[in-house]
Regions:
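Domain-level signal for soluble alpha/beta catalytic cores
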Residues: 1-135
C-alpha cells in the first residue's frame, strides 16, 4: 500500500495531526511508501529534512497552484448542488514553473531521499516527462 497524505505549511495534516503520529498509529507491513499529495513545492522543501529520516520510501505529488497553501474548497466554492462553482484555476491561480525548473526542484528532493515522484494540480505532461529522466 502506498499511503497518500496532504500536508499544510506547518508539516501537519489538515486535521492537525502530525505525520509521525499517523505512521506510528497506522503503519503495517503492507505499507510500501508514503506520498505527500497535492502540496506546494515550498511545503515539500520545508518538510523534506523531516521525511528523509523515515524508514519508509517517500515522495510527493507537487501542485503548481499560484499560492503556497490553498484554503479549503468551501471558502471559495459556494455553489449549490445545481450551480457551477468557482474554477480553481481562477481562484488559486497557476505558477509559471518550467519543466526545467520542476526538474531542478525534483532533483534536489531526490538528493534528500525522495523516491516517489510526481505532479498534481497544474503540472503538465512536460513536467512529468522532464523528471522521468531522473535516476
Amino acid at each position: 500500500v502506498v499511503v497518500g497524505i496532504h500536508l499544510k505549511k506547518n508539516c501537519k495534516l489538515p486535521s492537525g495531526e502530525n505525520v509521525q503520529n499517523i505512521i506510528e498509529k497506522f503503519q503495517c507491513n503492507s505499507w510500501i511508501g508514503l506520498v505527500f499529495a497535492c502540496v506546494s513545492p515550498e511545503i515539500v522543501e520545508r518538510t523534506s529534512d523531516f521525511f528523509s529520516d523515515l524508514k519508509l520510501p517517500f515522495g510527493f505529488k507537487v501542485n503548481l497552484w499560484g499560492i503556497e497553501e490553498p484554503t479549503p474548497v468551501q471558502t471559495f466554492n459556494s455553489a449549490k448542488y445545481n450551480e457551477i462553482g468557482t474554477n480553481p484555476n481562477i481562484a488559486l491561480g497557476s505558477r509559471n514553473l518550467s519543466a526545467k525548473e520542476f526538474y531542478k526542484f525534483t532533483k534536489r528532493m531526490v538528493e534528500k531521499g525522495a523516491r516517489i515522484l510526481g505532479g498534481c494540480c497544474e503540472t503538465k505532461p512536460e513536467h512529468i516527462k522532464e523528471i522521468s529522466t531522473l535516476k
